[in-house]
């Protein structure tokens, strides 16, 4: 692969700084409107506190939601956060801004990877595409991005330096690659699987022979040795069970053919307007087939197999490369042909797509994006009351305004047990590490509770008497949060709230403009 001429180094560096600054601004403007971490992260918040309470020793279990969840999660970013919190840096502020900073660093990391697998003239374009893809940062800048951002950064750097090692067989690059993969392992398990399997496809591209297999094996083995103090301790404490349970919880059927067609929908690339990047991905796949770039085509479909639950967050790296192929092989030649002779009108035609993508990215981060919901000030006030005035181990049902969102997008559902130190019966987070299909049970419970929003209280009570949920203890409190911005249009929980207020078995024990809490007497 041709290297950059020395004369072009500084212009390239300047362009990279501009693109990275754009990435930082996009992330910052998404985070700033909320005074609380975006969306999820409550379980990791508790785990950081568990580490601090244990004197920075690795706890055996996390106290999150009083569920006896094994502390088997890769702990690197949690320890980094716990250490930074010893400085005058509030923990909630770290959960707001640390993922933002680490996620921004993935842009120059991707640049290093693109330099190894693309022509020099295409590298900055690929980096810009990666920057403008919402999937490259939306889940990384949330509160839960405290782990995802570290995993994404180290996995991309692993691929970049491994590609250098495959090309040059340098001991230095071998050691760096092994160290970076080790950091990925102790940051995020799913991204570890993505990095390891991606190494195989990079080997097919650079060294498709037995020598390449030996290089990949050496990197993986060395990284396992480097991380052995952690995973051997986890195996000694809990065995393989937590990892097998977590892996099983993520498995679900997915049809790659349907997925390819699904790219034309904006829900895959999370574009606000037309799915331009999704369409370019389809065109890029055609180009990769035409060029016989089977390694890239296979890499593109890899996340569907290894991480079916979260593959859209991992596919962004090969997707950016595929889109780059579409632009350089189809769009640029087309525009070059139609804009001759050069004029202001032709320049405008050439810039219309990148300008559109920039506008789309800016629109994505505007307030109101469902991905960037967070716990409100009224909800925080209610949670503080719960922590102060309800008995320890009290059991709650959380009825949040996100009736049409999945459990993973319900910020109150995860942050309530973290901040109140009380039990939320329908919170699935963390239960993927538990046996007996606990994760599936909690997800089902969450869905069942949503089905009771427009019914009377007996709907909630009947859930716990059904055979499926009979093993769970019944709730003692119900916390209902309303979206006041929608009260003039719809209020899914208003009917249930009125029913609870009129029932002799329920007593309103707390109320503020958004939240009402009821105690329940069976």
Question: Where are the regions a protein language model picked out?
Answer:
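Membrane-interface helix-loop-helix junctions at transmembrane boundaries of multi-pass membrane enzymes
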Residues: 5-12, 206-217, 268-301, 307, ...
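Transmembrane catalytic cores of multi-pass membrane glycosyltransferases
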Residues: 40, 179-286
């Amino acid at each position: 692969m041709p290297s950059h001429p020395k004369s072009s180094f500084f212009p390239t560096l300047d362009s990279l700084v501009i693109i990275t600054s754009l990435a930082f601004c996009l992330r910052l403007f998404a985070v700033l409107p909320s005074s609380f971490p975006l969306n999820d992260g409550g379980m990791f918040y508790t785990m950081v506190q568990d580490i601090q309470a244990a004197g920075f020793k690795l706890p055996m279990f996390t106290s999150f939601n009083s569920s006896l969840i094994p502390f088997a999660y890769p702990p690197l970013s949690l320890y980094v956060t716990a250490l930074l919190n010893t400085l005058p840096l509030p923990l909630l502020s770290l959960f707001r801004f640390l993922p933002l900073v680490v996620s921004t660093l993935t842009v120059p990391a991707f640049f290093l990877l693109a330099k190894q697998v693309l022509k020099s003239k295409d590298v900055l374009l690929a980096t810009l595409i990666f920057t403008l893809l919402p999937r490259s940062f939306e889940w990384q800048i949330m509160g839960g991005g405290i782990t995802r951002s570290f995993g994404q950064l180290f996995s991309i750097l692993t691929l970049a330096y491994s590609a250098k090692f495959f090309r040059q067989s340098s001991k230095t690059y071998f050691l760096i690659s092994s160290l970076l993969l080790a950091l990925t392992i102790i940051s995020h398990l799913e991204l570890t699987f993505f990095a390891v399997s991606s190494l195989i496809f990079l080997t097919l591209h650079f060294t498709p022979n037995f020598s390449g297999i030996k290089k990949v094996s050496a990197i993986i083995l060395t990284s396992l040795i480097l991380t052995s103090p952690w995973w051997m301790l986890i195996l000694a404490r809990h065995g393989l069970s937590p990892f097998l349970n977590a892996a099983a919880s993520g498995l679900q059927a997915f049809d790659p053919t349907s997925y390819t067609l699904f790219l034309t929908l904006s829900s895959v690339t999370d574009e606000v307007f037309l799915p331009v990047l999704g369409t370019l991905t389809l065109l890029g796949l055609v180009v990769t087939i035409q060029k016989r770039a089977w390694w890239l085509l296979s890499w593109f479909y890899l996340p569907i197999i290894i991480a079916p639950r979260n593959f859209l967050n991992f596919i962004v790296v090969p997707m950016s490369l595929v889109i780059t192929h579409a632009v350089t092989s189809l769009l640029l030649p087309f525009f070059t042909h139609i804009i001759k002779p050069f004029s202001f009108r032709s320049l405008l035609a050439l810039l219309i797509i990148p300008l559109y993508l920039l506008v789309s990215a800016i629109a994505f981060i505007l307030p109101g994006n469902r991905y960037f919901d967070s716990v409100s000030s009224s909800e925080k006030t209610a949670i503080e009351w719960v922590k102060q005035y309800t008995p320890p181990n009290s059991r709650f049902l959380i009825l949040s305004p996100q009736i049409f969102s999945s459990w993973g997008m319900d910020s109150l559902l995860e942050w309530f047990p973290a901040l109140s130190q009380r039990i939320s019966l329908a919170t699935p987070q963390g239960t993927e590490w538990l046996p007996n299909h606990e994760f599936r049970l909690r997800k089902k419970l969450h869905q069942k509770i949503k089905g009771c929003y427009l019914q009377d209280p007996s709907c909630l009570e009947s859930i716990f008497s059904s055979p499926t949920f009979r093993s769970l203890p019944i709730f003692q409190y119900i916390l209902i949060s309303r979206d006041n911005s929608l009260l003039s249009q719809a209020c899914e929980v208003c009917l249930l709230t009125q029913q609870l207020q009129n029932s002799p078995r329920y007593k309103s024990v707390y109320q503020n403009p958004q939240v009402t809490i009821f105690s329940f007497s069976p």
